[in-house]
Amino acid sequence: MAAATSATAIVNGFTSPFLSGGKKSSQSLLFVNSKVGAGVSTTSRKLVVVAAAAAPKKSWIPAVKGGGNFLDPEWLDGSLPGDFGFDPLGLGKDPAFLKWYREAELIHGRWAMLAVLGIFVGQAWTGIPWFEAGADPGAVAPFSFGTLLGTQLLLMGWVESKRWVDFFDPDSQSVEWATPWSRTAENFSNSTGEQGYPGGKFFDPLSLAGTISNGVYNPDTDKLERLKLAEIKHARLAMLAMLIFYFEAGQGKTPLGALGL
């Protein structure tokens, strides 16, 4: 008796404006037909799988559709955390520039979050407005000018230069020659595989976006995506808050003073 087995798979993508809110949305149709023959007996089985439609892009102006690239730029596909299609000046048309601006937004947003916290805590602790914190020449500084210069110029400059190099050449700074004072360069490697989110034991010591098992960091994709969205939202709020703080400082006011505290 002869036995024969044949299997064919046809993947057909199609779009549905109704399902995607007027935007192209891909679906997959998988058709499998298998036959197993033994003598005169034949078994035929068909399987059809239809994938769910992709979620429509979010707009920075709710309930507004269309409007061309001003309201819905084609170069923003919603894949970036916090992407609501806001790019009226077209700064992200070039993918290379888009990658650079996202990195810049992350870095400036993280500094802004630290600054906002420092402004509130510093004034609440000492009573000195943040824009007058270094105005008293007779105050006893916790460190010398040389220490400040060395910290800013050498240490922070060195770290920032390595981050800049790693942006253009990912993972180039996680090798032994780049971290000679570390026993394992892997501690400084990108554990998530995404630019701007290194993760790992040193950059995620509390395991907020992953777990550490037998000394190895394992990222949790779901947690990481939620935290990336939360971070970029708080970062943007902090940058706006700093802009307001600058306007207040120009009038001699402080954030706590504006709140009546």
Swiss-Prot record:
Signal peptide: none annotated. It is a multi-pass membrane protein. The chain crosses the membrane at residues 111-131, 139-159. Residues 1-51 form a transit peptide. Pfam families: Chloroa_b-bind (PF00504). SUPFAM superfamilies: Chlorophyll a-b binding protein (SSF103511). One of its GO terms (cellular component) is chloroplast thylakoid membrane. PANTHER family: CHLOROPHYLL A/B BINDING PROTEIN. It is found in: Plastid, Chloroplast thylakoid membrane. Belongs to the ELIP/psbS family. This is Chlorophyll a-b binding protein CP24, chloroplastic. Its main location: plastid. One of its GO terms (biological process) is response to light stimulus. GO terms for molecular function: chlorophyll binding.
